[in-house]
């Protein structure tokens, strides 16, 4: 099996397939993603989320903000299971969604844990990390503000944020408050979308 050109082992494929079944079951009673995107679960959500691991395929410690339906946090945690290293801290304050995330991690033997707390309280509970991810959560300025407790003054901590076609405007707005190094990774799944890699964060105002 391949996802965006990434060769996926039989074991990881099985984990992803089991996650997809769990997701479809829980999505009947909990609003995990926009209902209009459920039919495109593999392409729109799983393949899209797997790009995070393709960009950073190392056994590092992640914080996934506003994990919701598990994208990209659970997908990253599933890939880390094959590496037998690294960890994903999934932050989700909605307790029903947090229950789904715990079930998904447990049943796929993925490498992660769930923190059912507000993002603003997460850094005190989780501590340092190497990477931060978020998808469909907030504009770039908001994501950087959420990530600042981990990233400010930490040269080795990077943020990886999925963004749509309006990303250039979001970058310009964020640069009004922050200085940062930026790499734009073109999406292999969604045309005109990117994953923004942020590092060396400094506050301007």
From Swiss-Prot:
Group of enzyme by EC: transferase
Family, similarity comment: Belongs to the methyltransferase superfamily. RNA methyltransferase RsmG family.
Keyword Glycosyltransferase applies: no
InterPro entries: rRNA_ssu_MeTfrase_G, SAM-dependent_MTases_sf
Enzyme Commission number(s) of this protein: 2.1.1.170
MF (Gene Ontology): rRNA (guanine-N7-)-methyltransferase activity
Pfam families linked to this entry: GidB
Domain of life: Bacteria
Cellular compartment(s): Cytoplasm
Organism taxonomic ancestry: Bacteria, Pseudomonadati, Pseudomonadota, Alphaproteobacteria, Hyphomicrobiales
Record-given protein name: Ribosomal RNA small subunit methyltransferase G
Cystine pairs: none
Species of provenance: Rhizobium etli (strain ATCC 51251 / DSM 11541 / JCM 21823 / NBRC 15573 / CFN 42)
Binding site for S-adenosyl-L-methionine: 66, 71, 119-120, 135
Annotated catalysed reactions: guanosine(527) in 16S rRNA + S-adenosyl-L-methionine = N(7)-methylguanosine(527) in 16S rRNA + S-adenosyl-L-homocysteine
GO CC list: cytosol
């Amino acid at each position: 099996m391949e996802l965006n050109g990434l060769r996926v082992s039989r074991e990881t494929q099985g984990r992803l397939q089991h996650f997809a079944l769990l997701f479809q079951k829980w999505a009947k009673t909990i609003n995990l993603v926009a209902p209009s995107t459920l039919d495109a679960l593999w392409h729109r959500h799983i393949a899209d989320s797997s790009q995070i691991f393709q960009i950073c395929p190392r056994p590092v410690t992640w914080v996934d903000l506003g994990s919701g339906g598990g994208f990209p946090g659970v997908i990253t945690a599933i890939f880390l299971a094959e590496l037998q290293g690294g960890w994903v801290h999934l932050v989700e304050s909605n307790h029903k969604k947090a229950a789904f995330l715990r079930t998904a991690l447990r049943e796929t033997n993925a490498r992660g844990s769930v923190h059912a707390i507000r993002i603003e309280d997460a850094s005190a509970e989780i501590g340092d990390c190497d990477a931060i991810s978020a998808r469909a959560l907030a504009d770039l300025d908001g994501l950087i503000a959420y990530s600042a407790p981990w990233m400010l003054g930490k040269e080795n901590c990077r943020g990886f944020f999925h963004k749509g076609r309006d990303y250039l405007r979001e970058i310009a707005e964020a640069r009004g408050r922050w200085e940062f190094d930026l790499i734009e990774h073109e999406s292999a799944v969604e045309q005109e979308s990117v994953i923004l890699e942020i590092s060396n964060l400094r506050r301007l105002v």
